[in-house]
Amino acid sequence: MNKVKTILVNLSRALLALTFIFSGFVKAIDPLGSQYKIAEYLEAVQLSAYVPDWTQLILSIVLSAIEFTLGVMLLLAIRRRFASKVSLIFMTCMTAVTLWLTISEPIQDCGCFGDAIHLTNTQTFIKNLILLIAALILVRWPRYQSRFISKTNQWIAFYFTIVFICLASVLSLYHLPIFDFRPYHIGQNIKKGMEIPKGAKQTTYKTTFICEKNGVTKEFTEKNYPYNDSTWVFKDTHQEVLEQGYEPPIHDFSITDEKTGDDLTDSILNKDGYTFMLISPVL
C-alpha cells in the first residue's frame, strides 16, 4: 500500500511541478505579455481604472516568480508540507477563476501558458481540475515525496530559483524574451502566419439584423429577413460567434495608407525583394 501511495504522490508531484515550472517560465520571459493578460482580467471585472500599469507589471513578474518557484519546490521536495499546501491554495483559486471563465467567457484565452500554448477555457478548466486533484493528493500524503536534495541545501536551491526567475523577467523586460513565443517574433514569416490551412475549421456566426417599421423595431436573422418587404428599414446589425474556428497566429496585421485609406497589406507582403519599414510611435 505504501508503495502505491509513493508512486501516486510522486506522479502527482511531477505533474504539478513541471506544469508550474513551464507555466511560470513562459510568463516570466514575457512580462509585458503577462501584464496585458492581467489587464484583460481587470477589464473584465471593471477594475482596470483602479490598477495602474506599473502595478500590473509588478504583479505579472511576482505571479510568474511564485509559480515557477513553487514548481521547483515541488520538484525538489523543498518544504514538502508547505509547498503542498500552497499548491492546493493556488490551484483552488485558479480552478475557481477558470470555472468563471468557462461559464461567462469574458476572456477567450486564460493565458496560463502565455503565448507558448493556447487552450480554450473549457480545456483549461479540465486541466486545472486534474492539477487540483494532484494537489489534494500531495496535501494528504506530503511525506511520501522523495527528496532530491538534503534539508541543509534546500534553501540554496530556493534562493537561487528566485534570483534566476527574477533576472529572467528583468532581462526579458529590457531585451527580447529568451525564448520568443510571440506571433511577431524575429524570423517570423508574417504572410505564412496569416494563412489558414486547407480544411481548417471555420468560425460560424449568427448574424442579427435590426429593422424598423412604423415605429416598431424587430430583429431578424438571415433566414427570416424580409428581403421582399421594403417597408422594413434597416437600422443596425450585430454578429455572435456560435462556434470558434481556426484562428491563425497572426490575425490582426494590416497596413493602411492614412491619406487614402487604401489597404497596403497584400501589396507589401507579396512584394519581391526586401521591404524596410521604419516604425516610430512619435514623429
What are these regions (language model features)?
Residues P177-S267:
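N-terminal "domain-start" segment that seeds a small globular fold
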Residues T265-L283:
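Short active-site neighborhood of thiol/selenol oxidoreductases, capturing the structured segment around
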Residues F22-D30, C93-E105, S169-H175:
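C-terminal TM-helix exit segments that contain a strictly Trp-centered aromatic cap at the helix terminus
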Residues T92-Q145:
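Membrane-embedded alpha-helical segments of integral membrane proteins
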Residues N2, L76-A83, R143-Q154:
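Membrane-interface helix-boundary motifs at transmembrane edges
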Residues T6-A28, Q56-V97:
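Functionalized membrane-embedded alpha-helices
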Residues F148-H185:
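Internal/C-terminal transmembrane anchor helices
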Residues S23-L63:
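Solvent-exposed, well-ordered loop and adjacent helix/strand elements within mature globular domains
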